[in-house]
Amino acid sequence: MRFRIITLSCATLFLAMPVYPYGALGHETVGAIADMKLAGTPTGAQVTKLLDGITLARASVLADEIKGWDRLKKDQPKPIILKDQPQLQEQLVAFWNANPPTKAKGSDAPTHKEFHYTDVPAVDGSKYVKGNLGTEPYDIVQMIPFCVRVLAGEEPETNDRKITKPVALILLAHYVGDIHQPLHVGNAYFSSAGNLVNPSKGGKSFPDHGGNGFNIILADEKNAKSDAQGESKSGAKSSGKKSSKSKGNNLHSFWDTDAVVEALNQAEKKIESQPKHKGKATDEEVIAWLANAEPVEWKAKAKSPPTDWAQQWANEILPMSTQAHERLEFTNVTIKSESASGDATEKKMPDGISYTEWSGQRTQEELHKAGWRLAEIIEASLNTKNSQAQKPNSKK
């Protein structure tokens, strides 16, 4: 099944063709699950009011869409991405201006691009500890609670980051998805010789920036290449099949896109295997299934405030990030501009599960939890005493 971008209006799902490249599909899946969880609730009504009618599914991709403004100067007009919500558009422009794509000389203002990730070393036993290697004052683990505090009325909407309550909702809809993508949290580090290292043990090391510098080579692609070489030598016709899924893909893009498609295809097959189900599963059925079936171990630690949840989620996904690297062999590693790049080739694993199948299984689990967690963190943030005491500002 070819999944299309999914949006949700109140309790009714409808489809729209994608207009942007956990790519948009993953983010909108998370947002659509949360939309369904909150539909018909007082919190859902607050979300609709704050977002001027747009859904969390639509809101979930806006933090990536504004990256399209990054080529523009601060004083240049920004393309309209919310033509029917001019106040939201204005607030997003103010947010972009306060957190420019590049740091101005002598400025302490962070860039909004830093808010989407953290670079904790992807090694066994690794934990997110503020101030340690790979963390930043405005990384994703810090920005999620910042948005929570804005929604809860504990952080004024006049803050230096220009994050109003509507913008906080937009950012949460995106960041909660990002923090459930393993390469947005864990980072591989390499020695000058191109070997994977644990940077905490000392010595100079170079990050892979979430896999963006590595081209992923899956087993079927590797076999197809070998078959093609055999054909050229023998003249015989190759029987090897080459998958086009990850051709030319870097490792980060694989997790943003291919793993999501695999995850949703696996979900579709589970639905179709149910005794009473007839025909192909629809996109709406997949979202409804994920929204209605409670994920395993998705709840936060008992009595922990929502401002602590991002760190819990980061620590939960770090082992997955480590495994995402351990299932690959890194070769042809080069160091340039303090960053590592090269090839990442799928290993044959003892469990017999391919990298694509394994990543799809894990991504389905993470998308599922992320959708439920997005709904819960919004509900917890908007229903504190402070948030109830303040009227939401529709325009700043």
Q: What is the role of each PLM region?
A:
Residues T7-L8, D124:
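A broad, structure-centric signal for solvent-exposed, well-ordered loop/edge residues
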Residues Y20-Y175, P182-P350, S354-H368, W372-K396:
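N-terminal, motif-rich segments that launch catalysis or mediate targeting to/interaction with membranes
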